[in-house]
C-alpha cells in the first residue's frame, strides 16, 4: 500500500475520531404532531373451557395507535459557525449550529383518517422531532406551543427514528384552531446539515462563516451568496416536491 496510503488512512482515522466525539452530519426532521387514539381490534384466540377442551373464539380488544400530522408551515433559521479541531498533525472542520424552528399546525383532520373523535386521547398528544445528535445542547430544550412552554425530553417518537426530542402537550381539550410553535436547538456537527421539508409550505435560511459550501440534497437553494467570509442561502419548498403524506397512522 505504501507510505501515502498509510498517511491517508491515519488522516481518515483521526478525522473519524474527532467527528465521532464532536458530532457528525446533522439531519433535523420535524416537528410532527402525534396524537394517540384507541381502536377496536378483533382476533381469534384459543380458549380453554371448563371441561378441558380448547375452543377458538373471536375476541375484541382495545388497542392504542398514534396519528401523526405534519405542519401547515415551517420556517427554519440556522446559523452554523465552523471551527477547526486537531488530532495530532491532522485537522477536521466542525460546526456548531443554532437552529430555530417556527410554524403552525392546522387542527388535526381525524375524519380524513377515519378516526372517531371520541376515540382520540388528547391528554397524551405530543410534538416530536428527530435529530442525528443533540450532544451540543447545553440547556434544556423547550417547545413553545401557542404561548405555552413544554419541556422537550430526549428521544424521538417519529416512526423509524430514536434520537431526537419529544414534548408532551397534555391537552385539556381538542385542538380547535391553528396552533403556532417554536423550538430552538443548539447542535454540534460536521460534514453537513440537512433539514426535511415536512410542512405544506417550507422556508429555510442558513448562514455560516464557511467560505466554500457545497449544496446537496433534493432541493437546491432558491437564493445564495457565497463570500470569502462565509455564505447565506435560502430555500422555499412546497409539499408537492415530496413523496410522503401530510398525515398517517402508526
Which positions does each model-derived feature cover?
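Hydrophobic alpha-helical transmembrane signal-anchor segments
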Residues: 1-2, 6
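Soluble non-transmembrane domains of integral membrane proteins
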Residues: 9, 13, 20-21, 30, ...
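Membrane-proximal extracellular/periplasmic loop immediately following the first transmembrane helix
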Residues: 37-46
